[in-house]
């Protein structure tokens, strides 16, 4: 999956491609305000 996603970004520099892959790898189930940076599925007051 990640390889196919990176292949779709072939026109990007290696650093830009790595950024896309790293952002996909760091996806979390939950982030807590104010640390929601797009790297999570839900953003809430607590993840308990």
Swiss-Prot record:
Residues 1-26 form a propeptide. GO terms for molecular function: toxin activity. Its main location: secreted. One of its GO terms (cellular component) is extracellular region. Contains 3 disulfide bonds. They are not added, since framework IV presents two different connectivities (I-V, II-III, IV-VI and I-III, II-V, IV-VI). Keywords: Disulfide bond, Neurotoxin, Pyrrolidone carboxylic acid, Secreted, Toxin. It comes from the Eukaryota. The keyword RNA-binding does not apply. The modification Pyrrolidone carboxylic acid is found at residue 27. It is found in: Secreted. Expressed by the venom duct. The cysteine framework is IV (CC-C-C-C-C). Belongs to the conotoxin M superfamily. This is Conotoxin ArMLKMS-01.
């Amino acid at each position: 999956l990640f390889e196919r996603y990176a292949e779709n970004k072939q026109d990007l520099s290696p650093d830009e491609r790595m950024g896309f892959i790293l952002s996909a790898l760091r996806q979390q189930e939950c982030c807590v305000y104010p640390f929601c940076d797009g790297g999570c599925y839900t953003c809430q007051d607590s993840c308990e």
